[in-house]
Amino acid sequence: MASSSLFLLASLLVLASWQQAIAFDPSPLQDFCVADMASPVRVNGFPCKNPMNVTSDDFFNAAKFDMPRNTMNKVGSNVTNLNVINFPGLNTLGISLARIDYAPMGVNPPHVHPRATELLTVLEGTLYVGFVTSNPNRLFSKVVHKGDVFVFPKAMIHFQMNLDHNKPAVAQSALSSQNPGVITIASAIFGSTPPISDDVLVKAFQVEKKVIDWLKSQFSENNHY
């Protein structure tokens, strides 16, 4: 009987630990915690605004997600993020949103959200989407159409491309963090500040230094799309 009770207790502790471990953002300990962006306090996240000063406007954002964005750039895409940085009411709620506009043949380059899973819905057009796993780097990709949904697991390198040569495309993503973060792979490698040593990149990519220099020149203006 004692051993059964001990096993049950151990199982409950493992379950509790597992539930805590899989939480991407800390769980809220109150009804809401609107971020106080003016507070000098620095914590893992943002401190709460005095709840007595919270209004309905703290839970509203005129994001204009129905409006097309400018995609006139090198990659032909534009990501509009709605997260705790520009929507403090999302603090501790573990969710954020993004609208992605694609020019004809536009690409949302390979990137990572280190703190979130992404659920993408195609609103207009046809996209080629995919993600790559950790080593040995298996690719999962699919052509998705208007109304289709595709999920990118947390911290996996992923991308999207508009397959239409003439028409723009639009998608909307829900992310499982108030502040997912983004690391655009090419920009991080070839446009970091300070730059990564050429010796490292020449050896890593097995190319000549002039190729590395050319690649770095493409990201010298902090084009972190």
From Swiss-Prot:
InterPro entries: Cupin_1, Germin, Germin_Mn-BS, RmlC-like_jellyroll, RmlC_Cupin_sf. Pfam families: Cupin_1. It is found in: Secreted, Extracellular space, Apoplast. Member of the 12 germin-like protein gene cluster located on chromosome 8 in the major-effect quantitative trait loci (QTL) for fungal blast resistance. Partial suppression of the 12 germin-like protein genes increases susceptibility to the fungal pathogens causing rice blast and sheath blight diseases. This is Germin-like protein 8-3. Mn(2+) binds at residues 111, 113, 118, 158. SMART domains: Cupin_1 (SM00835). Belongs to the germin family. The keyword Disulfide bond applies. Residues 1-23 form the signal peptide. It comes from Oryza sativa subsp. japonica.
